[in-house]
Every structure is written in structure tokens, then in C-alpha cells.
Amino acid sequence: MRRRQLSFADGLIAEEVSDLRDGWMEHADAVLADEAIVSAVYEALAKRHPKSRSRGRHGTPAEVVLRLLILKHVRNWSYEVLEREVRANLVYRDFTGVGGAKMPDAKTMGRWGVALGPEVIKQVHERLVQIARAKGVTAGRRMRVDTTVVETDIHHPTDSSLMGDGVRVLTRIMRKITQIAGAVGTKLRDRSRSVKLRLLEIGRVARAKGPINQEKLKQRYARLLDTTSRVVGQARRFSDEIGRRVKRSKEILKQLALDGLRQELDLMIPRVRQVMKQTRARIFRGNTRSEGKLLSLFEPSTEVIRKGKAGRPNEFGKMVKLQEAENQIITDYQVYAQRPHDSDLLVAAIETHQALLGRAPRLVAADAAFYSLKNEAAAKAKGVKRVCIPNRSTRSAERKREQRKRWFRDGQKWRTGSEGRISVVKRRHGLDRCRYKGYVGMNRWVGLGVIADNVVNIGRALERQAIP
């Protein structure tokens, strides 16, 4: 059975605190109290340990966990800022349900976010869309869809900087191993200073132009590759010696730490070797293809994506699809492991719209990247009356007349709102750059950002409905 959290409503200042809330908070408060949403969060938290429900101290109520995570993304705060702000703010304490209780610390809240996982977050989002439909916030008569890039939290990738990262990480791990195991087996030789000098040399030479400087650049890269190769070889010997118990500890906890450090070496060594391989291919063989390149040792799923932006020709992250209905409600989001073409996403987006809102949209609007004759025919076959997707390359006079009609121009005006929605979720809810780790973390980050935006927009729409 879930435990109820005491709130300010049980005290003497509930009315005064409620008057200080933002307008959307009052209606969002009722939406987030939905039993299906709270139960989904409760079940996810209960799975952290097989006996979480029956053993240990009482945990924080699921309602509070959900509201704290949503507030974090509504305000685009870190967990540390969330802890500080809620502790000192009566309105946030009231909205999140913390009330007069002790505020959970940042590390605890971070563990909650990991415990929920992308599946539960997706479930919460879909339930919010159903609530928006039931309350008349959105009916699903129109749909617009667009894609954007959410960047991973990495520095701008270059071959030299990635090798520098690899040497730094491998050396740091080997230093920890030496501190635990002592001076047995292979001795650590720290080449960090040598690599740093190589990186500075490459930076100076790379700024100059001309064939002579290109030859100098190859020489500098050859030296950096040689030094990096020596560090990788040393790391492999360290890993092998831990496996053969040459490097070991008599204390159980320290031995477990050594085994964990060996796993870190075994994870990082192949990544550094891949960076070396792609560096040789680019510098010495002129292969500049980006497909399959490793762009970060810490976020290996990162892709380089070109969306044709003049100011940012290359973006490093994952492709995300956002589709909306009326009142700026995001009905679906999707993070793609590999970038698809936009035209491959339209039919699936319409099917998702039908599944969530129980009807085909009367109008579908998207930009020209989503257009194809096949997509237009498939959309009409699914019940869409008006497909408002421009064909920029058409030579057909009939098609050009169709695209000049008032309904088509009005649909394209409404479509531009999807670009505004993307701008809002990036600026207000932090979807410009993902602060969570890995592909799973990207899904959680995008999902919570979308939920935060929907909660605010549902609250504002219900606030407008309540005005007599």
C-alpha cells in the first residue's frame, strides 16, 4: 500500500501558499494525482530491490518522486539546484508534496530518475495525453510533426582530442590500480605530459595551411599515435595481470575494486583503438566519411547529424521526433538509435496518433522533408482528409495550384508552430543538450522534458477553460 505524504494542507498556511502558485500549477496538480500515473511510478520504484515493499524504511511517496522530477525539468535545473530551491521555497514544497518533510538529497533524486527508466516515463507521457483528450484540451483533429537533434554532453570531437581523452582515462585507471596493488608486475609509465605536448603541436600546425604544413601535421599525428599505442599496450598488460592475479589485494573490497577497474580498462581500450584506427584512415588515407565514427569515448552512441543549418552545420547527438496536436500538446516523441530519413516517419506518426487519440487527424502538416507520393497516398488511406506537406521539387502545375490554396497555406502556417515548440522545449526544458548518460539516459531526458512541457500546457489550457 502506498504511503501518503503530509502536506501544507494539514497545517495552517495552505491557503496562503496556494495563492502564490503559478496559474498552471493548480490544474496540473489535479492531473498529476491521476491514479494510473502514480501507480506506474510506484511499481517502478518497488522493483529496485526484490523486497522493496516489505523491508527497509519507508520510501518517499511515488507522488512526490514524480513531481520532483517533473519540476526539475519544468525549470531545467540540476538535481543540486532542485534540492536547494525546493528546500527554501514553500510553493515548490506544496506543489511537489514534500510539505514540511525533509527534502531528499540530490543523489537520492538521481537514483529515482534512473529507477523509473524510459519505459515508465513513456507510460506516464501516454497517460497524460489521454487525460488531455478526456478533459478536452486536445481532440486530435490536427497533427504536425518535425524532427530535431538533441546533443549529447560532449566536447567538439577531433581525432587528437579523442586520443588525448583516451590516454588521460587509461592513465587515471592504471594509477588507481597501482595505488591498490602496489609496485608489482608492469610499472606505470605516465605519458600524459608527452601527449599534452603532442596535442599542442597538432593544434598549432593545424591552424596553418599549405602542403608543407600538411606533412608536418602527419608527422605530429604519427608521434601522437605512437604514444597512444604505447599507453594502450600498457593498459592491456595491466588488465591481463589483474586477471592472472599478478596485481591483486588481500582485502576483499580492494580486490573487488581492482576487478571493477579491470572492467573499465576492458571497456575503454577498444574505444581508444577505434579512435586510433579512424585517425589513421583520415590522416594517412584521406578517408573523411563520418559513418560509424566514434565521436566520444564516454558517449559512444553519439552521431554526427547535418540538418542544413547555416550556423551549426554539424550537430553531435541523437535524432528526436516530436509530434503535436491542438493546444501545443506533444502527443508522441521518439529518440532514434540510428538517424532515419524524415520521409520514413510520417506513416508511423499517423498510426501513433490514431492509437493515442482514437481517430485519424483531419489535417497532417509537416515540412518538405516528410514528403513523398507514397506517404501522401498512405496518409489519405488512413483517413487523413488534408495532407499539408509541400513538394518543393514538383514541376506539376496542378500540384503548384494545390499548394497555393488557402487551406494549404493555413496548414503550413500552423506547421511552423512545431519549430516554435522545439525552440521552447530546448530553451525552457533543456532539450538542447542531454545531461544524462547513454542512449537510455537520452530517452529519459527527452521523455521528462516532453512531460514537463505537456504538464505546463495542459495546466494553462485548463486554466483558460475555467475562466467564465
Predicted region positions:
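Mobile genetic element proteins and their domesticated derivatives, centered on retroelements
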Residues: 68, 82, 146, 322, ...
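Electropositive, glycine- and tryptophan-enriched low-complexity nucleic-acid-binding patches
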Residues: 301, 309-356
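Active-site- or DNA-interface-adjacent structural scaffold in DNA-acting proteins
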Residues: 99-301
